[in-house]
């Protein structure tokens, strides 16, 4: 067997293995297992050929061993963690497949050059990326014979027509390091071929981007659409092509920055620092590390007018590579990645502190191996949207504990996965709180904040913070748009130091009540007569005192909400409160914006009631009632109380018309009818809500037999409650009765009577 045939078979094996990984994570285990069997079949055939003994023995053996282990793990269902599954499922992008780098053994991974075909073929279907409509260009296959890593040759690379100054600056910064290993890791195989794999870091992993050997060329022009140099050097243009392919717009480049692009090329930790007051960030530390080749540096201009740009020799919205710094004169030498035909902009220029106000960002990429021994990462999906109703406890949260007696520096890097939707609108943030055990933060003011707010619309966000000795923290991720993310953590503690998904402080969570306020039950605050119409719930703590956290979370952005908890008794179970009794309140906090939260310590066995209210009435909006406690699940129950006065309900309204009594005739149609009457006075004609300041007459109500005027229930006490008068009465016989409604003095206004009953009845 010829080597080119062997390489083609190996290429098909690793490609099929990547698809098997993806299918396994997608839940198509049977397909994945079948693909593994196909791989083993091919490898068994290869092992029997002469080629097996000609340098490929270990490669075939390593892939076979890995495939068989992967097959067994599929059967056991334990090959991938949740994070790894999401990472693999993030491989599909713009209809293309970009698998993570797979390590088969300590000597072999999927980027190895022997796992790519070597034959040069004329392809009918080329890897064509979109081109700018304004340019007359075409694609050609190129012979790539110059694979030099020589500094002098690569340092002449430049950007021409394509506006990707960030990428060219990033590649030039690696060249300035003279790190040939970083350059070699960008593309494979390093020989003339039709197919190449480029290794770029995005979507939480080093990923392999397959491209062909076609590049765009302009018709009737000496200008270039690709990265170029004075040499016949094409391999950097292939890496550029892979980079543009991943971003999705091809040669219609839509922008990036040097820090992000350098991260994609090297995995060096990116930091984007705004330049404020013409001062650079921590110059001494940065330049010391720059001299030791531990950081890569760049700088980006802000928006400049055409006149100012020409005058200063700065390009508007442009990234430059930083090549040196003079600590005495505070001058910085920059390298311009762009060369124009008329050479109106210099390739190298020197700036001073006085020029910094023309620049907007300082780009730093830190070599992780120079500053940290260990890295841990987790990939997850953010399904909810901040600023549109998402509350703190619904956001992804992670628990972190410093196990040492010393302060520890930890860096967190949050990566937003491609593709980017509504890029400029999406803000991301990392919030860190000091917590007792790294438990989930329910509301923002519950715990001490350990970092400052620094949200960004960048695809990457770096947060540096110092952990106190033995202190636990909770990391909260915030985003304005749903997306997939990877959170990376760099540390010097140990390989086993990780963060985990945060859990609630208490172990038992009562199923969340998803409810809503409507025009029927949005009663407003307790100073309104409709307060008792709000949604209400029974709480029963059965035998053990319990610690319980209760939260009310609304969908409102700009409305105040609250919940009140009242002491009750067994006889009140299933019945709604009829007045706001402050003496029975467990807590009486002020209304707060969008949510209310309380952490009750040692709530005693007994019966309680919750009333959920917004400060304003007549609102429409959803809310959730969350309860978490530390007692056994069956020790606490929460049930919603039905809002109706009875199974059957009728209403009657009348005007007082300067009188002080009114007779309402009604007929019970069945035996043993249980009636509840709710009498409400209104002083205003077109207003169905009374407030504390409104006049209310004292009223009372009694029930009589309509046939003989015999009293059924006499109520002698007068009542002027804001929430109205309630009368409960059991009527044994089906016949006609009178509800006599009286007020203390004659007057005006109207009275509304709601009647509820467990059996049918009629108002006459």
From Swiss-Prot:
Pfam families: Calpain_III, Peptidase_C2
Gene Ontology MF, one: calcium-dependent cysteine-type endopeptidase activity
Enzyme class: hydrolase
Cysteine-cysteine disulfides: none
Listed EC numbers: 3.4.22.-
Catalytic site: 165, 318, 336
UniProt keyword annotations, A-Z: Hydrolase, Protease, Thiol protease
Biological process terms in GO annotation: proteolysis
Ranges for domain Calpain catalytic: 95-368
Superkingdom per UniProt: Eukaryota
Family, per entry: Belongs to the peptidase C2 family. PalB/RIM13 subfamily.
PANTHER family on file: CALPAIN-7
Protein function: Required for the proteolytic cleavage of the transcription factor RIM101 in response to alkaline ambient pH.
Protein name, entry field: Calpain-like protease palB/RIM13
Organism: Debaryomyces hansenii (strain ATCC 36239 / CBS 767 / BCRC 21394 / JCM 1990 / NBRC 0083 / IGC 2968) (Yeast)
Lineage, broadest ranks: Eukaryota, Fungi, Dikarya, Ascomycota, Saccharomycotina
């Amino acid at each position: 067997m010829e080597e080119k045939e062997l390489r083609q078979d190996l290429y098909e094996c690793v490609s099929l293995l990547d698809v098997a990984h993806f299918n396994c994570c997608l839940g198509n285990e049977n397909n994945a297992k079948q693909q593994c069997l196909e791989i083993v079949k091919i490898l068994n055939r290869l092992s029997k050929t002469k080629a097996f003994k000609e340098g490929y023995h270990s490669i075939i053996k390593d892939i076979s061993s890995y495939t068989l282990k992967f097959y067994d793990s599929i059967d056991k269902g334990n090959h991938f963690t949740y994070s790894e599954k999401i990472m693999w499922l993030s491989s599909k992008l713009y209809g293309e497949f970009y698998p993570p780098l797979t390590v088969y053994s300590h000597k072999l991974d999927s980027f190895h050059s022997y796992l790519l075909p070597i034959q040069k073929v004329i392809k009918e279907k080329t890897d064509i990326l979109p081109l700018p409509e304004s340019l007359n260009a075409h694609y050609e296959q190129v012979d790539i014979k110059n694979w030099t890593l020589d500094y002098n040759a690569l340092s002449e690379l430049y950007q021409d027509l394509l506006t990707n100054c960030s990428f060219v600056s990033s590649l030039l910064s690696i060249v300035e390091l003279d790190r040939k290993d970083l350059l070699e890791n960008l593309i494979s195989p390093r020989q003339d071929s039709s197919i190449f794999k480029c290794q770029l870091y995005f979507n939480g992993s080093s990923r392999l981007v397959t491209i062909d050997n076609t590049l765009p060329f302009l018709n009737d022009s000496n200008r270039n659409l690709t990265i170029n140099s004075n040499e016949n050097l094409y391999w950097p243009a292939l890496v550029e092509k892979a980079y543009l392919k991943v971003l999705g717009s091809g040669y219609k480049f839509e922008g990036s920055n040097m820090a992000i692009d350098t991260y994609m090329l090297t995995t060096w930790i990116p930091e984007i620092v705004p330049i404020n007051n013409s001062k650079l960030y921590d110059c001494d530390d940065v330049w010391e590390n720059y001299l030791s080749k531990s950081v890569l540096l760049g700088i980006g201009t802000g928006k400049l007018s055409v006149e100012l740009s020409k005058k200063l020799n700065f390009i508007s919205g442009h990234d430059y590579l930083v090549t040196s710094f003079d600590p005495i004169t505070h001058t910085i030498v920059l390298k311009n990645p762009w060369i124009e035909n008329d050479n109106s902009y210099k390739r190298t220029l020197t700036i001073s502190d006085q020029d910094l106000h023309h620049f907007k960002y300082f780009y730093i990429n830190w070599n992780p191996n120079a500053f940290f021994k260990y890295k841990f990462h987790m990939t997850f999906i953010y399904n909810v949207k901040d600023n549109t109703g998402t509350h703190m406890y619904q956001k992804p949260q992670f628990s972190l504990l410093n196990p040492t007696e010393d302060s520890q520096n930890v860096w967190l890097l949050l990566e937003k996965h491609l593709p980017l939707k509504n890029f400029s609108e999406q803000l991301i943030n990392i919030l860190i709180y000091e917590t007792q055990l790294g438990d989930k933060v329910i509301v923002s003011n519950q715990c001490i904040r350990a970092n400052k707010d620094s949200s960004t619309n960048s695809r990457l966000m770096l947060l540096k913070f110092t952990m106190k000795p033995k202190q636990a923290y909770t990391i909260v991720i915030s985003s304005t748009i749903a997306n997939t993310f990877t959170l990376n953590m760099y540390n010097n503690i140990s390989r086993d130091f990780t963060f985990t998904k945060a859990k609630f402080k208490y172990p038992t969570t009562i199923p969340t009540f998803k409810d809503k306020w409507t025009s029927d039950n949005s009663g407003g605050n307790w100073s309104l007569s409709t307060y008792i119409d709000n949604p209400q719930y029974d709480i029963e703590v059965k035998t053990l005192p319990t610690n319980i956290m209760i939260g009310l979370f609304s969908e409102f952005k700009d409305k105040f909400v609250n919940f009140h908890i009242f002491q009750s008794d067994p006889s009140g179970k299933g019945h709604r409160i009829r007045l706001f009794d402050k003496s029975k309140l467990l807590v009486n906090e002020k209304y707060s914006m969008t949510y209310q939260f309380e952490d009750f310590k040692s709530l005693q066995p007994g019966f309680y009631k919750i009333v959920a209210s917004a400060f304003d009435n007549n609102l429409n909006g959803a809310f959730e009632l969350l309860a978490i406690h530390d007692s056994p699940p069956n020790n606490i129950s929460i049930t919603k109380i039905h809002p109706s006065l009875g199974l059957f309900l009728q209403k009657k309204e009348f005007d007082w018309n300067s009188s002080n009594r009114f007779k309402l005739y009604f007929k019970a149609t069945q035996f043993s009818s249980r009636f509840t009457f709710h009498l409400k006075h209104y002083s205003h004609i077109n207003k169905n809500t009374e407030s504390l300041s409104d006049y209310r007459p004292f009223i009372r109500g009694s029930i009589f037999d309509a046939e003989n005027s015999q009293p059924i229930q006499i109520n002698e006490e007068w009542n002027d409650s804001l929430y109205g008068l309630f009368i409960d009465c059991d009527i044994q016989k089906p016949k006609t009765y009178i509800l006599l409604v009286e007020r203390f003095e004659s007057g005006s206004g109207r009275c509304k009577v709601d009647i509820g009953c467990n059996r049918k009845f009629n108002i006459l």
